């Protein structure tokens, strides 16, 4: 039997969500700073690719190998056409950053709910 990697995967995602929330909070804090450039982190898929955590392939037709490796970095956020560069010269859009913050919250809640459910299933299995 192969080890269950769900807990490690969830832990990695929680770390990534924490880092992203920190960057988004920094963007919000600097919304009025002249010439401040909004930042974001690389997508979680890139982080997942780097950690070499994946699902076990038990049959050749089940999972395709996605071998794109990227660095996890803080990068300048893409300019939204609506926001663009403001008079102060910065690229922070409060509505967009608050939306990102809400998305991070939902992803974190989903992450913790999945772990709780999986933990309950494991406990039920052990008790029987």
Stretches with model-predicted labels:
Residues 1-128:
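Amphipathic alpha-helical polymerization modules
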């Amino acid at each position: 039997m192969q080890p269950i990697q769900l807990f490690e995967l969830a832990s990695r995602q929680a770390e990534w969500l924490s880092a992203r929330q920190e960057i988004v909070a920094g963007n919000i804090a600097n919304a009025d700073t002249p010439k401040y450039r909004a930042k974001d982190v690389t997508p979680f898929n890139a982080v997942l690719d780097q950690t070499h955590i994946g699902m076990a392939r038990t049959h050749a037709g089940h999972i395709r190998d996605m071998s794109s490796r990227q660095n996890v970095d803080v990068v300048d956020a893409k300019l939204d056409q609506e926001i663009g560069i403001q008079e102060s010269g910065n690229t922070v859009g409060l509505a967009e950053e608050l939306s990102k913050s809400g998305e991070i919250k939902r992803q974190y809640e989903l992450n913790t709910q999945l772990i709780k459910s999986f933990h309950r299933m494991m406990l039920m299995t052990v008790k029987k």
